[in-house]
């Protein structure tokens, strides 16, 4: 499978994508692999392990996971066609953040934006495959979204425009989005929304909601890359900071002082970090 991806993308198009904005940032493949390296090697030999990216933008996390599973499961499922079918249909799942990124993710993962056609690596019954996108709306209470805190004046939009109401965090119980258990949840969630006062340091962070929702699913492992500004709290991050620092399941934290060291061309103050949360770690 890795050789197929290399033939399809040479050079790797996912290392060349322009970011959607400073808030929705594509993850370079090398950073994705650094994050996946934090997981135990045994996970790649487990045909029962399930993986979820709850904030698919380019599909790079699922694609790199697929490469590792293809290699790791070879002794267990020697027939490659059967192995690939199993990996894509039974192990890899994604929730896209927009309709556009759902198509891009499917193109990256399945080599076809419509995985129910003959050009897909694996042919599904549906046009979504295992990477879904369902348009959501904000739930307004006193001019703020009850889930993400978005400003009604900024995001109460015409139906033809993007709502930025991300499915994974606009619901009380994330099990209602995908009613199944996941061993690994991994991704790079959207970072912030304009709160009516500007962007950058004055924008409202939302990445913490993705982390909190992922924890509700109680995976074996959770790995995400997010801005480091939560280290100092403020801007609605005090509770998140306190919970992260007191959570003994946080087994690893890698920090980059300069955001551009991870995401070239992206200007966000405070740096970036990625972490591994291990359900069975108590340190």
Please give the residue ranges for each predicted region.
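SAM-dependent methyltransferase catalytic region
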Residues: 2-262, 271, 278-283
